[in-house]
């Protein structure tokens, strides 16, 4: 029975809710069925054993979560303020990520990786972001984007060449955005011209996260402009390749320890064996990877919101005004309760999207919902925390202002909040 249930869960198709116009709405309301469940799945789960709550973790997940929390508090927290001020990540922090196995979470153990689950990556990103969003981002890019792309689309030779290094020593970055190709990423102008057994890449990319520390760049370039966006191809480019230049890091509002740089390509010669997947399929890989990566950003923003909340509540339970603890004023209690409820909703959305991905089930809508809600909430809750703490919350002597600055990027990268709403609306339209 359990095996059959697993097969149904993994193979279930998205239920299209096309109700006949003659059907009375009171008999079968549209909301009666979850958009991510098929009828077979519903039957299988209704008669089977009770399903575990979303916040039930395996022993491995609990162990990873606990270890990362300890690492973040002991090896990241002491450097957070300095890294933010200097706009530079401490080498010891990056080395620690590799030593702890946090840069190759899903990479198979035969390549030197941890061999854990995608959900484990989500837990790691969340725990790191509670302490520092920049460190969480480095881990997020490596695990939810680069490692997964090479694992899914790479040849055995590419996996053997890059995955061991990505798991143990080499940070990475993905190059998609350009000056005129942000949300409209398929409008990219970077080109890749075939010359014998090589491709020559020319162009420039903008807003490239982790560019300053990356030893490997996954680059999207158009190999056939006559085919439009279907000419976009994905290349694996080593950081020391001649003609690849990383520019000066941007002076950003938040996530300052994470380098965000322009990257230019001047006659960069890449062997055709470094094409990831198939020529002209880069746009598919980009869409698929970003859909998955959005769950990572949701986890990051969830961590930012939770970290700020965890710091603020003890403060307002101690500080007194008018002879009472600030926390004891009903007006503030209502605000705290509202934020705590929204925080729990963001966590459930994020965990659900991650579990759906692991089960091989449709999760595009759920990933966008998680990213949208967690990102918007992070901005709101960090703003509220500053207000709750009063004047000290507005100073750099306390970390809540940094959480506030770090939160803003969540509504921008890997698809703005408006792009997420577009995606969610398209999915809803397809369901009815």
Curated annotation (Swiss-Prot):
The keyword Mitochondrion belongs to this UniProt entry's keyword annotation = yes
Subunit info here reads: Homotetramer.
**Which keywords accompany this UniProt record?**
Acetylation, FAD, Fatty acid metabolism, Flavoprotein, Lipid metabolism, Mitochondrion, Oxidoreductase, Phosphoprotein, Transit peptide
Gene Ontology CC entries for this record = mitochondrial matrix; mitochondrion
Which positions does UniProt annotate for FAD binding? 174-183, 207-209, 319, 330, 387-391, 416-418
One of the record's GO molecular function terms: short-chain 2-methyl fatty acyl-CoA dehydrogenase activity
Listed cofactors: FAD
The active site annotation covers 414 (proton acceptor)
Entry's family note: Belongs to the acyl-CoA dehydrogenase family.
Q: What Enzyme Commission number(s) does the record list for this chain?
A: 1.3.8.5
Q: Where is the signal peptide?
A: none
Q: Which gene encodes it?
A: ACADSB
Indicate where the modification N6-succinyllysine is found in the sequence: 70, 284
> Could you tell me what this protein is called?
Short/branched chain specific acyl-CoA dehydrogenase, mitochondrial
**Organism of provenance:** Bos taurus
> Out of the domains of life, which is the source?
Eukaryota
Record: transit peptide? 1-33
